Curated annotation (Swiss-Prot):
A GO term from the CC aspect: cytosolic small ribosomal subunit
Species for this entry: Xylella fastidiosa (strain 9a5c)
Keyword annotations: Ribonucleoprotein, Ribosomal protein
Gene: rpsI
Name listed for the protein in its UniProt record: Small ribosomal subunit protein uS9
Any one biological process term the GO annotation gives: translation
Record has Flavoprotein as a keyword: no
Gene3D superfamilies: 3.30.230.10
Record family assignment: Belongs to the universal ribosomal protein uS9 family.
Key word Ribosomal protein present: yes
GO molecular function per UniProt: RNA binding; structural constituent of ribosome
PANTHER family linked to this entry: RIBOSOMAL PROTEIN S9, SMALL RIBOSOMAL SUBUNIT PROTEIN US9M
């Protein structure tokens, strides 16, 4: 008997996450490690759990996550989007609720490129009147 699972991808900044949602007891594994071990910060763990708490599915699924690139905040945001997409694939009636909460929208903000002649993207040399 094949394992039925739902799949979702999420991206944020330079992070990418692949999410596999299976019926289970609420275990969340990121890159082979438990969620609490993978993310040191409590805020990152809260971000990951938001779609599940909103739809009251915290203890209904086992989630297997592969996250690459970026930092902790970017990966947490990518995972949140991926989980939301996987939940919609599982049950399309959850989509309006997740969209209203903003979990279905990809955060398009990226790092602005450094410009030639400037120190950073916008930081210029100090202006001297004389």
């Amino acid at each position: 008997m094949p394992i039925t699972q739902n799949y979702g991808t999420g991206r944020r900044k330079s992070s990418k996450a692949r999410i596999f949602l299976r019926k289970g007891s609420g275990n969340i594994t990121v890159n082979g490690r438990p969620l609490d071990e993978f993310f040191g910060r409590e805020t990152a763990r809260m971000i990951v759990r938001q779609p599940l708490e909103l739809t009251k599915n915290v203890a209904n699924f086992d989630i297997l996550i592969t996250a690459t690139g970026g930092g902790t905040t970017g990966q947490a945001g990518a995972i949140r989007l991926g989980i939301a997409r996987a939940l919609v694939e599982y049950d399309a009636s959850l989509k309006p609720e997740l969209r209203k909460a903003g979990f279905m929208t990809r955060d398009a903000r990226e790092v602005e490129r450094k410009k030639v002649g400037l120190h950073k993207a916008r930081r210029a040399t100090q202006f001297s009147k004389r």
